[in-house]
Amino acid sequence: MLDGPLFSEGPDSPRELQDEESGSCLWVQKSKLLVIEVKTISCHYSRRAPSRQSMDIQASYWARGPQSRTCRLRPGSPEPPPRRPWASRVLQEATNWRAGPPAEVRAREQEKRKAASQEREAKETERKRRKAGGARRSPLGQPRPEPRNALRAAQPTGFPVFSRPERFGQVGRAPRPSVLPQGDPGVAWAGPWGGRRPGPPSYEAHLLLRGSAGTAPRRRWDRPPPYVAPPSYEGPHRTLGTKRGPELSRAPTSSAPVPATTRTEGGRTKKRLDPRIYRDVLGAWGLRQGRGLLGGAPGCTAARARPESCKGAIEKSSGLVAAGLNSAGDSHSQGKTTGGPGTDAALSRSAISSPPRPVPRSRQHLRGSRKGKEGSEQIWLPTCWLASPKKPPVRHSQTLPRPWAPGGTGWKESLGQREGAEHETLEVWKVTRRAHTLPRISRGPAGREGIFVIDATCVVIKSQYVPTPRTQQGQLVPSGESCSVSDSLSQPKPCHEEEGEGAAANPSVCQKRLLSSRVLNQPSEGRECEAEVGQQGDSSLEERSSSGLGFPVGEVNPRDAPTQPGSQEHPTLGPAAPVCAGSLKGSEAAGVPRRAGGGWARTPGPYAGALREAVSRIRRHTAPDSDSDEAEDLSVHSGSSDGSDTDAPGASWRNERTLPALGNTRPREGGKTAGLSDSIREIVDVISQTEEGFIREDTRKTPQGNRERE
């Protein structure tokens, strides 16, 4: 499931990879600069599901119907959506969620379910009341006998407690899966199908429905379970945190305090997932160590304590739970109070440790604020999670897939001893296991029930710069200029002035070749060719030159670079070219640090000014052809062409442009007027002038260069 294109997680995606490499990237996109890896780890582990069931999310456990203990489908629950094979793995399914049976059918079913659950709950509540002494029931104040109403009130509250009293009520008896009062039509959480929800179910609901908690025991639970696409966003999308407004509002029926708690918990002060998500989908991972469910209740500890009661000391459990609930509930008495009967039910249920049934999230929220939750949350813990004192958790039935499981070794041990050393266990556990790897509840699922789902998508976006390949530094320009590339650009290569001029005269060929060959290092050609090349491939040349020369882009040929915004590496050429351009000028130019542009850390090549000038012209495509006037203008332009140069992203070329502007301006002014040869000569002159005015201009222009560069 981790393999394959991000969006084609479908049947076509490489299954073997998915199966074999759960760790492989779901989707990797690489470009020169960006590597995006999307890794999705989705682990679904359903202990409760009958082995025979294959794990297809579509066979959601609710779809499974009553058999799906996990889902706790009520017999009346709407028919399961047609099972969709896992094969269709889509990140976003067109319809992951079913509207469910028609509203009336749903309502009817829900009513039936509700009635049944209420009756059962009434009975349970009575029993619990008797057992627990009605510790919490009184707060409700509603006669439990009237379970229907009380239940109703509680249910609106979203107290799963009420809906699942039976669960706690009988230790031995597993609560009827179908009983969940979820169906309460009024209940917002009626269920994706039952809820009158126009939109896709919340992701939690979606997971539950999709069988995200696959009902079938994972065939290969060493591997993460298949990916469950989020519900489609065709309708208003309920996110996990959606308020169960209706429930909350109804919750007050059971008791105002609960709503307060709900407010806290369900009211999104704290976003809590449906308890079932914690219990079934998230499995142990959903339980936070010290705190019960992911929701963050200390319920865990309470749950831990509960296992003993689970043994069958329902009463004791009730006491424990009551104590826990009371402590929690007391701390959040409102929530607890709200759940008076519910609390009892919860206690008995918790004690029963019967497999949890899905419950409206609100319930959990109502269940309480953290503290309250602590007691309540246990309720959510599937029995299997509570290490049954009687039977050690099945080693392989750990909630987590083996590879990631904290480890069969320590895990079970820690959990196993839980009974006596509940807290200590947790402590030990924490110590021994890394927090992030250990299941949130240190309680190994003893039974088949429960679903373990880890759905983690990790998107790694690495921005890595892939430098362009460096070119050989020593390429000679074949254009007849036989200047050997000067490895150190700054070292003025005493090219013959005539040669330099010749190069300038043949700048197209020379520079093209130079730049093309990235022989920016060749001083004379570097300079002359640079001018030519500047036009042709300023950016590429600059890059190449910087690569070949090994200079910083800005350093190579600032003048060159300006032609192309991208020609930041041309600036690297700049120094090299100037070296070639004129040794004489080079010395002067060398004397002048090319700091003006701020582009080069090192001193500019001897002919940096001239080169920059040439490059500027090249970039501007305004090389003075035969017109010295034009050349002068160009020099002016080169000064003024900063804008265009500025366009270039590279500061270095900007600097060089600025420098060329300086150089050009002066050189142009003082440049010889002639044909192309003159232009070359002019370049040489410019170099000399550039050196003179370069310092001046440099000083003057440096700010500009810096500005441009920046």
Swiss-Prot record:
Question: Where along the chain is composition biased (Basic and acidic residues)?
Answer: 105-127, 265-274, 693-710
**Which residue stretches belong to region Nuclear localization?**
113-131
Query: What are the boundaries of the region Interaction with ACTN1?
Result: 341-435
State its location(s).
Answer: Cell projection, Dendritic spine membrane; Cytoplasm; Endoplasmic reticulum membrane; Perikaryon
Matches recorded under InterPro entries: Dendrin
Which regions are flagged for Basic residues bias?
A: 360-370
Q: How does it sit in the membrane?
A: Peripheral membrane protein
The lineage's top-level taxon is Eukaryota
Query: What tissues is it present in?
Result: Two forms of 81 kDa and 89 kDa are expressed in brain. The 81 kDa form is the only one found in kidney podocytes.
Q: Which residues are annotated as modified residue Phosphoserine in the UniProt record?
A: 388
Residue stretches in coiled coil: 103-134
Provide this UniProt record's keywords sorted from A to Z: Cell membrane, Cell projection, Coiled coil, Cytoplasm, Endoplasmic reticulum, Membrane, Nucleus, Phosphoprotein, Postsynaptic cell membrane, Synapse
Recorded GO CC terms: dendrite; dendritic spine membrane; endoplasmic reticulum membrane; nucleus; perikaryon; plasma membrane; postsynaptic membrane; presynapse
Region Interaction with CD2AP and NPHS1, residue ranges: 407-708
The UniProt function text for this chain reads:
Promotes apoptosis of kidney glomerular podocytes. Podocytes are highly specialized cells essential to the ultrafiltration of blood, resulting in the extraction of urine and the retention of protein.
Q: How does it assemble?
A: Forms a ternary complex with MAGI2 and SH3KBP1; recruits DDN to the cytoplasm. Interacts with MAGI1. Interacts with ACTN1 and may interact with WWC1. Interacts with the podocyte slit diaphragm proteins CD2AP, NPHS1 and NPHS2; the interaction with CD2AP and NPHS1 is direct.
The protein's name is: Dendrin
Q: Which gene encodes it?
A: Ddn
